[in-house]
Amino acid sequence: MDYGDIYIAEETEWDKYNRQINKNPDDFDAWEGLVRASEHLEGGVGRNSSKQAINTLRSVYDRFLGKYPLLFGYWKKYADFEFFVAGAEASEHIYERGIAGIPHSVDLWTNYCAFKMETNGDANEVRELFMQGANMVGLDFLSHPFWDKYLEFEERQERPDNVFQLLERLIHIPLHQYARYFERFVQVSQSQPIQQLLPPDVLASIRADVTREPAKVVSAGSKQITVERGELEIEREMRARIYNIHLQIFQKVQLETAKRWTFESEIKRPYFHVKELDEAQLVNWRKYLDFEEVEGDFQRICHLYERCLITCALYDEFWFRYARWMSAQPDHLNDVSIIYERASCIFASISRPGIRVQYALFEESQGNIASAKAIYQSILTQLPGNLEAVLGWVGLERRNAPNYDLTNAHAVLRSIINEGKCNTGITEVLITEDIKLVWKIEGDIELARNMFLQNAPALLDCRHFWISFLRFELEQPLNSKNYTEHHARVSNVMEMIRNKTRLPPRTIMDLTKLYMEYLCHQSNDPSVLQEYLLIDRDVFGPFSVRESHWKKLDEGQDLKQVSTRLLSTNGHPGISVNEAKIKSGESPYEKYYRLQGVVETVTSGVAANGSS
């Protein structure tokens, strides 16, 4: 066969990164590589590039920012690209998408408003955008770039009145640049009419205080002449007092700024990134939130949470905290729903479904049953058999069942069990939960007992099943008339746990303690003390007297035979030696340690030395 005409295309950088992303959508480095590769298509995508290259870059930006909407720098790059290839309107559309995705970014609002200043001749539209930005980021401790741009805009418009109003607003906010803004405010206020410096009622009070003071008396020879104040002197005195009022505001803001500087100075990464934050950063955010919550200003608390959730967007604990704090505020339940929705739909990984389950519980609490059910179903679409979601859905069906009819709750459990998408451990837990519905909710004790007994042979490894089975029998009503029957049933379950199950030794020991407490505290038969002491010896005594463990070592043999053989072979009972297994490399102590609940790591010396 002639292979000369066959051409195998070499994988491009773009194809390589795209393939990596398709394989792992959470590979951030691959995403950044794909953006770079897209930007360099055809030697660099620009106005003269092919439509295919331009649309490819747009598509990559859309995909990337859809997954990581908090990357303000990439929104800026996307907007600049659109301005270059399609004009101001297309660029503005990207900025609008950007501030919808990250509405509390000082940098993005500053860039957007600067763009609007240069491309829009309607001052009112630009001013309106600045006002929106001020409401979103104006309280940010590091918002001075935005405020500087806002002041620059009003100066360009030759609106000193607006400049003064902005500065008057700024001197009340604890900011990194608070002192600079106060100095500028003092400077600008000197040229402002006195009527603009304070509210009319405050000015009237100051004027009354000034005019109430006695006039100056000047000596002229032997005469004393009273000099009445003129308006200029009154205004000069009023301005001095107004300055003192503003100075008090400055000192208060200075104190508030100093309080926050303790936390602000510890923020090393104020922007979003997928890299983990170190514990010191997380602790600082927790303490900062504690501080603002104690201060009690609703707007400042909300803004700090939003700042925190830019940096800590991938940490579920802060989403939980924000939602819980907001739920304690009067008339803000809709905001709680929005917080849960943002976390669930964008930021919290599906591999950690806890925030989604909490969202479903919140929706159910508000009567939104269909919404809650849809949340559980969406989790199970991505994580088939997720226990938290399944049990949440079952709980929803149980709580909202008409006339306590649990048909739907059982149907959810059994359909998921029968689908076979769960691992064995999850399936066993779901079977147990199905039985517990019959026991605890429907109250059909006989049916529940039969279900426990029927499933017991298949669930010998399931800790949850056997804990539930034992508790089921322990919690049945006990009185003097049914003691014998009650004890027999509890004892039967305990016998299966100790001799038939394959549970870890620690679990068996814990369940045995429960049974011993039952014997000691709920029995009215003195003879059970013999059983109590026998179990105590068998569970807590030295291994040489634990007869049940001998049986497990050599099942099916007579107890005396096992004891005699082990003693003669090993010098003491308790460890069964098999020469063939030793030669193959298996430690004779392995089973001993396993039954003790200890992992054995010793390798037989014969095998280790290579002897045969």
Curated annotation (Swiss-Prot):
Record-linked Pfam families: HAT_PRP39_C, HAT_PRP39_N
Annotated InterPro entries: HAT, TPR-like_helical_dom_sf
Main location: nucleus
Disulfide bond positions: none
Keywords: mRNA processing, mRNA splicing, Nucleus, Repeat
Membership in a protein family: Belongs to the PRP39 family.
Function as written in the Swiss-Prot or TrEMBL entry: Function prior to stable branch point recognition by the U1 snRNP particle to facilitate or stabilize the U1 snRNP/5'-splice site interaction. Has a direct role in the assembly or function of a catalytically active spliceosome.
Protein name: Pre-mRNA-processing factor 39
Source taxonomy: Eukaryota, Fungi, Dikarya, Ascomycota, Taphrinomycotina
Name of the encoding gene: prp39
